[in-house]
Each structure stands twice: as structure tokens, then as C-alpha cells.
């Protein structure tokens, strides 16, 4: 059995776990680990310019692959800088292991230089956390961390490692565990057969059923089963922001995204339904609006691997705890074995839905003479043939991308849904591109969000990571401005940004390509130019209509079907 120092154990454990990339930033408490990375090799380290960006890069890598992202930061400010990224991963159930350095064990609690209680600070935003007390525990602790992060409902796990446990002068026998035994942690992956049969029977007699798909369906890798099931029973399908791509957005049975900025047909169908089958969803406030008015005639069936999510916000008639893929396979098996089929004709239900679809709630003014954000997203969709990985920041541009770029595959839509973290999109896009070097990766951002982590242009230069940044520049914090327009009588308090840099020239100063677009006439040709450049990052700064709002938009405190539509529809209704 070979002997390794604690620092070497960290690196060798990551290698044995199959880690490809570590995203991080060195500092005193982790210098021995960084030296081991240099000495042992076998792992590519990406040196970021801020620890928050390291977590977002690992996040993008994880979301687009289903693998566990890995982060390495030093103690104190290195660890605390990572917290926002950890929160982002936690709220969206992203598998990640964050290794944080810690001061010497005998100095913990003494207010030592760069000491902070990482376990205490991170506890509310992690799935689990560990502190390593002796070097011999490093392999088993990391094995547990990766297992916990990737199983059940995934999430970030922090491993805090005091500096003395990675001392290079002491060697210990090394063996990486083949498996993990955690008696207190045993996620339920197979749904209860009685509940599954009960749910299927309820679904088959429903007159207005609808499938509501969330991010948990993507985590469960159940798209194939979901498509078979929905098409077998001719069921309408809608999705949360996080679930986009789990079911093909261009399929005729897909009603679009639901929720605050969901489509008319999706939100109205939910409100009018008599049965909702929720698959890997949280029923959070952005998808339910006023809970007291929520879908008054609907019985709810909820499939989720996390039992604490069931009936947390919406009362559930038939709960099913389990992996969505396994449960859907059980559904399909019952349909085949027992020859079950829908006992109701859904033709009249589809006629209602098609009437709502006919209103074309996503239409907008295409003749105004200024560039509309929707036009940009539609052009990006055409030019990428719908095959791009799209990493979005947070704001109006996020909603425009979700509504106007149809995703037909899972893990191609990368965004911060639960935390709504500005500054997420660009570093996440870099992580996605590292995971998919042959894929087209687009970052859709705004002039506000991009400045949150714009320093990562330097990281992209150092490692030659060619993504296309589409910056919808309206010189405002657009989503906040929209609320100020609609709710605060147009009082734009602290949302106008009058000191923006020349983004194109800034990108060029880092060695990238900068492109400016100011008029609709040049939009298509300059975007074509941007996507024709393959080996360099391209920053496309696009001046868009500053007065444009995201529609549809639910009325605050209303029911699912109470919505403000875009102006063209308001004029025709």
C-alpha cells in the first residue's frame, strides 16, 4: 500500500474519483494541496479571478454533464467568497464538492489569521459538511462527500481541511474506498407500487390532466420515459424555468414555461386542470403565485426524490417518493402489462388549450425600428439551430431566453433559478464550455449582470475558452426597472447605469473579439459573424429597447391565469 501525505491524498482521491477539473484560487491554508496538484498532476486546475466564479464554473460544468463539480478555496475570505455560489448550487440541487482550507487545528477558535467557521457559515446552504480531523480520514471523507453530493436530491457538500492535516512531511497509507456505507443516509429511489398504481388510475380518469415538469426530471435523466409517457396518453406538458429541456419545447404537446412569466396556455391550463402530475418540482412561489387561489379544481400527484418537498407548499393528494425515471418506468410498465389507457377523451381539453395557444402570447412589435431583446434571442436560436448550450444570467434577459429559445434536450439550459444570482451566467458558461469543448456555448446576459463577474474575461484568456457572450444592453437593471414601471409609477430608483464601459473594447483588451450591434438591420449579419469565430471568446454588445418589458406576466397575488399580456394581445382582446 502506497504512502501519501495529506495533501497528496486530497489530489489522489480526486483523481480516483474521476475528477477532470478543479476550479479554485490558492491561498495559505491550501498551498500544500496546490503543491500536490503541481507535483502529482492528473487533474486540470482552472485558476479563476474570484472564488464565487469558481463555484459558478463548477456549477455550469455539473449542470451540463450531471457530474459533480469540484472547487478548491483557501480559508477565511476564500471560503466566504464561495458562499453565494454554494447557495446558487444548493437552491437548484446541483452536485458539487467544495474543499475549503482551514487554519491549523490547534488555532481553530483563536481568531487566527484568515480563520472563519466555514462549517457554521455554510450549514444553511449545503446538503452536508465535513471537517477533516486527521489526514488518514481524507480519502473516506472525500468519498462520502462525492456520494452525498450526487445521490438522492443532489447538492453541494463542503469539506473543510485544516492546514496541519495536509502537512507534506508526514506520510500515511493510502487507499481510496470502493463504496460508501452511511447508515443514516439512504435515499428512496423506487416509488411505492401501490401509490404508483393509485396515481396512474387517477390520471387515466382525469378530464383535464397536465404534466408539470421541473429540474428534478433533468437530474433524474428521465426525458426518454417522460416523452413516451406523455405521448402515450396525449397529455399536455408544461415546465418550470428549471425544467426546460426535460421535454422537447418544440413538441406540439408542450405548452411552454409556466409561472410568473409563463405562457398564457401553460398558466391557464394549470389553473383549469383537474389533475396535476408534478415531476421533480418544488411548487415554489414563482410557479404558483397566490397559494390560496392555486389551481382550485386540481388533484395533485407529486413525484420527488426528496420527501421534504412533497406537500411543503401545495397539498398533495398522492405523494410518490422516488427517482422520477424509475417511477415513470413503473407507469409505462403498468400501461403495457395491464393494457391500461385513458378512460376519458381529451379532445375537448386540447380544444380549450389550442384556443389559448392561438392568442400567441409571445408575439411582440417587430417594426419599432429598435432592437427588441426577443429578436436577439430568436436570431441566436436560428443561427445555432437550437443546439447551443445557453447559460443565462439573471434578469429580463433570462426570461427572454427561457421564452424565446426552445430547448429540446436536457442540460442545455443553464441558469440560476432558485437563488436568482446575478453574475452566474458568464462563469457558468466557461464551465459548460470546458465540459463540452465541441459544443456551441452562449452566455445570455445584461449590462448589469455581466459586471458582477466580468473579471473572468481574464480566466477565459488564460485557458483559451471560446464562448459567445450576448449582452442585451439596455443601460438599466431591466427587471427591477420593469417592476418600478408597473408598481412604482415609473420611479426608477437606482436602476439606471450611466457609466458603462465599452464592453467590446474591454473584451478586446483581454485578447478577445468585441462586436457592437446598434440597429435591427445589422443584427443578423453581425451575429453570424460572432458565431463564425470558433477559437476565441466573442463579446457581442447589443443595444436593445430600454422600454421593453417581459410579457406575459402574472398579476401579483393573483391566480395562475391572472396575467398581463403583451401589448399587441391587449389591443386585440
Curated annotation (Swiss-Prot):
The gene is ilvI. GO terms for cellular component: acetolactate synthase complex. Keywords: Amino-acid biosynthesis, Branched-chain amino acid biosynthesis, FAD, Flavoprotein, Magnesium, Metal-binding, Thiamine pyrophosphate, Transferase. Its cofactor is Mg(2+); thiamine diphosphate. Belongs to the TPP enzyme family. PROSITE patterns: TPP_ENZYMES. Its EC number is 2.2.1.6. This is Acetolactate synthase large subunit. Contains 1 molecule of FAD per monomer. The role of this cofactor is not clear considering that the reaction does not involve redox chemistry.
Amino acid at each position: 500500500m502506497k504512502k501519501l501525505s495529506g495533501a497528496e491524498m486530497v489530489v489522489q482521491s480526486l483523481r480516483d474519483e474521476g475528477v477532470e477539473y478543479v476550479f479554485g484560487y490558492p491561498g495559505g491554508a491550501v498551498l500544500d494541496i496546490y503543491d500536490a496538484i503541481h507535483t502529482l498532476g492528473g487533474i486540470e486546475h482552472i485558476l479563476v479571478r474570484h472564488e464565487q466564479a469558481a463555484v459558478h464554473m463548477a456549477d455550469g460544468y455539473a449542470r451540463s454533464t450531471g457530474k459533480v463539480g469540484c472547487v478548491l478555496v483557501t480559508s477565511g475570505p476564500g471560503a466566504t467568497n464561495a458562499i453565494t455560489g454554494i447557495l446558487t448550487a444548493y437552491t437548484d440541487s446541483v452536485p458539487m464538492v467544495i474543499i475549503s482550507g482551514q487554519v491549523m487545528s490547534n488555532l481553530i477558535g483563536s481568531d487566527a489569521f484568515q480563520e472563519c467557521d466555514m462549517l457554521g457559515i455554510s450549514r444553511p446552504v449545503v446538503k452536508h459538511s465535513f471537517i477533516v480531523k486527521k489526514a488518514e480520514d481524507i480519502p473516506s471523507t472525500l468519498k462520502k462527500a462525492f456520494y452525498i453530493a450526487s445521490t438522492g436530491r443532489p447538492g453541494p457538500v463542503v469539506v473543510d481541511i485544516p492546514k496541519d492535516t495536509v502537512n507534506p512531511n508526514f506520510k500515511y497509507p493510502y487507499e481510496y474506498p470502493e463504496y460508501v456505507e452511511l447508515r443514516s443516509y439512504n435515499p428512496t429511489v423506487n416509488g411505492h407500487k401501490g401509490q404508483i398504481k393509485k396515481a396512474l388510475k387517477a390520471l387515466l380518469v382525469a378530464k383535464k390532466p397536465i404534466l408539470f415538469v421541473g429540474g428534478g426530471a433533468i437530474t433524474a435523466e428521465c426525458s426518454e420515459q417522460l416523452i413516451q409517457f406523455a405521448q402515450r396518453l396525449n397529455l399536455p406538458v408544461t415546465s418550470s424555468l428549471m425544467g426546460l429541456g426535460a421535454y422537447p419545447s418544440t413538441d406540439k404537446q408542450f405548452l411552454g414555461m409556466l409561472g410568473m412569466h409563463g405562457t398564457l396556455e401553460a398558466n391557464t391550463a394549470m389553473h383549469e386542470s383537474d389533475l396535476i402530475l408534478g415531476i421533480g418540482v418544488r411548487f415554489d412561489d414563482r410557479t404558483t403565485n397566490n397559494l390560496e387561489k392555486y389551481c382550485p379544481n386540481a388533484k395533485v400527484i407529486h413525484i420527488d426524490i426528496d420527501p421534504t418537498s412533497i406537500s411543503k407548499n401545495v397539498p398533495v393528494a398522492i405523494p410518490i417518493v422516488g427517482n422520477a425515471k424509475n417511477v415513470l418506468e413503473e407507469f409505462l410498465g403498468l400501461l403495457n402489462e395491464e393494457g391500461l389507457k385513458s378512460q376519458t377523451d381529451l379532445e375537448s381539453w386540447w380544444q380549450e388549450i389550442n384556443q389559448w395557444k392561438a392568442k400567441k402570447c409571445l408575439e411582440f412589435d417587430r417594426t419599432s425600428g429598435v432592437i427588441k431583446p426577443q429578436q436577439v434571442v430568436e436570431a441566436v436560436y436560428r443561427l445555432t439551430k437550437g443546439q447551443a448550450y445557453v447559460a443565462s444570467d439573471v434578469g429580463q434577459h433570462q426570461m427572454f431566453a427561457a421564452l424565446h429559445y426552445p430547448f429540446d434536450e436536457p442540460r442545455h439550459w443553464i441558469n440560476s433559478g432558485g437563488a436568482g444570482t446575478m453574475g452566474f451566467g458568464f462563469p457558468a458558461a466557461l464551465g459548460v464550455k470546458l465540459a463540452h469543448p465541441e459544443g456551441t456555448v452562449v452566455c445570455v446576459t445584461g449590462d448589469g449582470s455581466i459586471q458582477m463577474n466580468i473579471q473572468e474575461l481574464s480566466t477565459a484568456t488564460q485557458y483559451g475558452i471560446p464562448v459567445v457572450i450576448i449582452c442585451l444592453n439596455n443601460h438599466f437593471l431591466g427587471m427591477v426597472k420593469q417592476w418600478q414601471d408597473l408598481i412604482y409609477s415609473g420611479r426608477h430608483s437606482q436602476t439606471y447605469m450611466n457609466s458603462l464601459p465599452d464592453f467590446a473594447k474591454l473584451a478586446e483588451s483581454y485578447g478577445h473579439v468585441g462586436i457592437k450591434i446598434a440597429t435591427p438591420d445589422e443584427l443578423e449579419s453581425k451575429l453570424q459573424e460572432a458565431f463564425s469565430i470558433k477559437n476565441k471568446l466573442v463579446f457581442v454588445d447589443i443595444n436593445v429597447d430600454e422600454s421593453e418589458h417581459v410579457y406575459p406576466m402574472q398579476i401579483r397575488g393573483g391566480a395562475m391565469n391572472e396575467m398581463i399580456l403583451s401589448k399587441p394581445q391587449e389591443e386585440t382582446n
